[in-house]
Swiss-Prot record:
Free-text description of this protein's post-translational modifications in UniProt: Ubiquitinated. Targeted for degradation by the SCF(COI1) E3 ubiquitin ligase-proteasome pathway during jasmonate signaling.
Function: Repressor of jasmonate responses. Involved in tolerance to salt and dehydration stresses.
GO cellular component, one term: nucleus
Protein name: Protein TIFY 11a
Entry-linked Pfam families: Jas_motif, tify
Subcellular location: Nucleus
Sequence motif Nuclear localization signal, location on chain: 117-124
All copies of domain Tify, residue ranges: 62-97
Subunit field text: Interacts with BHLH148. Interacts with COI1A and COI1B in a coronatine-dependent manner. Coronatine is an analog of jasmonoyl isoleucine (JA-Ile).
SMART domains, A to Z: TIFY
Organism: Oryza sativa subsp. indica
Family listed: Belongs to the TIFY/JAZ family.
Length: 179
């Protein structure tokens, strides 16, 4: 593997050691299909481990041929069929030994620029909104004010009286319902 990430290298080493262990301890020759050259080392080791016969240690019970062992790593899923609990424990020991002490996993870098990105996005949105014509509501208000200004003074006074009468009518309706 040509990766520079230390976790990737450690995992690749663990998979290589696992592959060697399975090949060395298998009593039958491996029946694994040839692996394509484009497949990464992790997938090749997992394919070899899955195709290899199960190694049974003395004192270990096999319940129906073992279970599936699934490894999630770097966005890939590796499933090993017929994995006994003893083999799973051995795999875990190899993986922890290859990690070199099993230190705490590194926290992902904090996304410090996230609020800045939101602020910039909001500024762009407001700038676009300011560039568009006035909103529909404000245009109606402007039109209504312009219409009132165009009316002759006599009609304006009559409209004001009608508005006042509307309010008085509302009060009288309430008085009629209370009887």
């Amino acid at each position: 593997m040509a990766s520079t990430d230390p976790m990737t290298r450690r995992f690749a080493v663990a998979c290589g050691v696992l592959s060697q262990y399975v090949k060395a301890n298998s009593s039958q020759p491996s029946t694994a299909a040839p692996v394509a050259q484009g497949v990464s080392g992790l997938m090749a080791a997992a394919a070899a481990a899955a195709a290899a016969p199960v190694v049974q240690e003395p004192g270990c019970e096999v319940d129906g041929g073992g279970q599936q062992f699934t490894i999630f790593y770097a966005g890939k899923v590796v499933v090993i069929d017929r994995c006994t609990p003893a083999m799973a424990a051995e795999l875990m020991r190899f993986a922890s030994a290859a990690q070199g002490g099993g230190g705490a996993p590194e926290a992902p870098p904090a996304l410090v620029d996230m609020p800045i990105a939101r602020k910039a996005s909001l500024k762009r949105f407001l700038a676009k909104r300011k560039a568009t014509p006035a909103s529909a509501r404000s245009s109606y208000v402007v039109r209504a004010a312009a219409a009132e200004e165009e009316q002759p003074p006599a009609k304006k006074a009559k409209a004001d009286v009608e508005r006042r009468e509307d309010w008085l009518a509302l009060g009288s309706l309430g008085h009629m319902h209370s009887r």
